[in-house]
Amino acid sequence: MKKALVTQAFGDKWHKVLELTKPRMEAYCERHKIDLISIEKPLVEPVQYSKLAIGNIIATKGYEQVTFLDCDILVANDCDEIGTLLEPDCTFMAFDEGSYLDRKPGLKGLADAFGYVPGWQPSFYYNTGVFVMTNKAVGALSQPPIGLFPNHFAEQTWMNLQLHLWSTATCSLDPAYNCMTSVEEHFGLDRYKDAQIIHYAGQSADINKLIETIKADDAKLKELGR
């Protein structure tokens, strides 16, 4: 199976973040024989929607499975190949943060604004900073109408709407593979010992502080042989 890991970073500040996190992504790809693709020029605004180009990458380069990681992520050096966790009938796998965070009302509001089925209620809300998808889920990467790109958690809420709209065969990723601060608190995880992937979601307000946090966590993981 032809596989790739895709990440993206835009602007000098985020390129500095990627400089810190990319070596671990490269090591992960080398261990698991996966191609690494880094999108570093924005294709649309908000820039986070650039990840929708994964559909084109799949179609033009023949990938059967793609793992996406935000650039503000540290991958432990003993991290399993995430794609092997994909259930047989599942075509899109991500962590369902809507199971414990109040995300679904915003998704419902977006659906109503775009004229989705009246009375519809969302059944999940995935964090799209880490996901695995196959070439059977490309429809979920559909773009919004030109000039109407919603900015509700960037592209995340729109992608969740598309996953519902296309009746994509989804499955939930273990929180250890998307260990955000809220995940640590809710599930009682230790980022250094339990996490396979540490995700610094929601910490971009102070990039310099984020960079120092990533440096410190990277050093701690190395100290633990991870």
Which residue ranges define each predicted feature?
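A residue-level signal for conserved active-site and pocket-lining positions in enzyme catalytic cores
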Residues: L5, C29, G55, D72, ...
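Short, flexible, basic/aromatic active-site loop/helix in glycosyltransferases
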Residues: K108-P122
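Catalytic core and acceptor-binding pocket of nucleotide-sugar-dependent glycosyltransferases
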Residues: S123-L210, D217
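Short catalytic/ligand-binding loop motif for oxyanion handling, primarily in non-cytosolic enzymes
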Residues: K13-W14, P46, A76-N77, G83-T84, ...
